[in-house]
């Protein structure tokens, strides 16, 4: 009987924790470029549909880090998941670099409701 209570409590905790998960991911189309060549960078956020998402305010012409510039910003793309319970919002950027080096691209930050989440970091070789 005691084992059954612990099992039920464990299942409740697992399902409660799974509901609040937010996943933030950033990917580069190419990790290596020539000077002036362009590549895509995509930021994707998966979260519960009833939550409010605020993406980073990155504009065309802005530098992510010195010498790595955003040359184009696409409109966000939204995918509905799990019969409307979750969603993924993806934002695509086109970037270029103006000098040869290894560039550390720091994590991108998003806000979901009142919590801040960060993506993975990347390294770009030019």
Could you say what each language-model-derived stretch is?
Residues 1-27, 41-42:
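Bacterial Sec-dependent N-terminal signal peptides
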Residues 20-126:
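Surface-exposed interaction/ligand-binding surfaces
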């Amino acid at each position: 009987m005691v084992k059954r209570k612990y099992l039920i409590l464990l299942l409740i905790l697992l399902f409660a924790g799974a509901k609040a998960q937010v996943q933030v991911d950033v990917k580069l189309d190419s990790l290596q470029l020539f000077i002036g060549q362009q590549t895509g960078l995509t930021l994707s956020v998966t979260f519960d549909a009833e939550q409010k998402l605020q993406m980073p305010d990155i504009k065309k012409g802005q530098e992510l880090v010195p010498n790595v510039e955003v040359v184009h910003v696409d409109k966000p793309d939204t995918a509905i998941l799990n019969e409307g319970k979750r969603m993924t919002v993806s934002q695509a950027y086109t970037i270029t670099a103006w000098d040869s080096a290894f560039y550390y691209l720091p994590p991108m930050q998003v806000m979901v409701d009142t919590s801040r989440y960060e993506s993975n970091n990347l390294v770009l070789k030019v």
